[in-house]
């Protein structure tokens, strides 16, 4: 009598199949993570470019002076009646995992900071005061201190608004790395309005370089006008 039953998988065969699936997943996950990181970095640069356009329009209306004052934050001035920024969400980095709102208050996540050195007693300087616009950083992601990428800036932050200075964050402390590429890279917006991906640290031009003009002649001008 002929046996028409299909042969079943043996336990060993099933284990082999599961092992192959596990290997394939372990190979594809890093690729997925890399693609996701690149997409976020691209979106982050796009946000900074939109902030650049908004800031330029604001400065054109205000004698070439940067936003922010002793009574108003730079964020609120850029988003004033949606005149320069259409939505608050542009001020949230894709690396910021917090939920946000369009209220412009304590429920609104702010991920970017303005270079604190453009203010003198909370009064912003004119762009004409910047010695080297091509190397002077104006805006960058403003992280809180810690071993992971995180942010805590809010729409109701104190005037003149959330700032950033080299490897420090406001509010926060000392940041331990960039936002992407295993915290080795960070995007920044410069005073000539170009956006650049920078190394977090190193022997050449780097985000945290402020005291080594030997390997980076422009270091003194990166954070100081």
Annotated model-derived regions:
Residues 2-46:
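Amphipathic alpha-helical segments typified by the pilin-like N-terminal helix
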Residues 42-225:
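Short, well-structured segments within or immediately adjacent to enzyme catalytic domains
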